[in-house]
Curated annotation (Swiss-Prot):
Keywords: Ribonucleoprotein, Ribosomal protein. This is Large ribosomal subunit protein bL17. GO terms for cellular component: cytosolic large ribosomal subunit. Pfam families: Ribosomal_L17. Part of the 50S ribosomal subunit. Contacts protein L32. One of its GO terms (molecular function) is structural constituent of ribosome. The gene is rplQ. It comes from Caldanaerobacter subterraneus subsp. tengcongensis (strain DSM 15242 / JCM 11007 / NBRC 100824 / MB4) (Thermoanaerobacter tengcongensis). One of its GO terms (biological process) is translation. InterPro entries: Ribosomal_bL17, Ribosomal_bL17_CS, Ribosomal_bL17_sf. Belongs to the bacterial ribosomal protein bL17 family. It comes from the Bacteria.
Amino acid sequence: MSYRKLGRPSDQRRAMLRNLVTDFLRYERITTTEARAKEVRKIAEKMITLGKRGDLHARRQALAYILDESVVKKLFDDIAPRYKERNGGYTRIFKLGPRRGDGAPLAVIELV
């Protein structure tokens, strides 16, 4: 399984992605770098698929990754039912251009 290292040790990378996924599911739209957005998309799609399953085991798996219990509740009660007829492709990434300061390519990731 391939993944992006994002210039961080594994524990910092995992913590950063957990924070980004939690914020993405809370606000349904975030601005970040392209590489981070692509990694967030992979994880967020899996979380939404867990939400669509809707059983206790899926809820516990989501709670193990998502940092905030209220976000898990939103995922299972609000977000997942929206996509019950859709098989994947729950997110969309728009490229914004370079970030002022360091020139990193920015992107917006949002729910479809």
